[in-house]
């Protein structure tokens, strides 16, 4: 499948990912974006077949305002964004695609558990990254103490985090800046955005030692940019 990761911080940290391929509405396209997206998929498949690629992976492209696609790199492994692709994937009409399991299966020399013809997508997935950077200070990395971190559970929501939910957490100076990934599913882009904002509104984040304001700034940044998501 495809996903769009155009909304990033100045440090090139991806902040919002959308599947299938979408784009910020602030970009005014003068080309057929659906055609370009189809071409990108066709090019990627052709390259994979040409070199005999047999693994999970991501072909990363950048598209100019004229609609010219350029291949940037191939990540020959699973990526942290795999969850937003998996949440919209359906195999034989059923949910439950596990891309990490497929990565292991191919590494063992086993065939994939399904064929391309058996794969379809349903709905829209949005992934938010809560990152230890301060959007109000040029996305400068920050450390501090998180006193409380919680949200309202929902059947359309998955939150992955290493931050403890039952006791405070001190962000160290040597750390993975990704504090949490939130994956939201909706039947269409409008529902996905509505649910995404509902999740952000439900977040309870309290911090001390400088962590409080950056935490709130992160949520405000994600809220502001949720409105910029628009399907090709």
Model region roles, listed by residue range:
Residues 1-232:
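ATP-dependent carboxylate activation and anion-phosphoryl transfer catalytic cores
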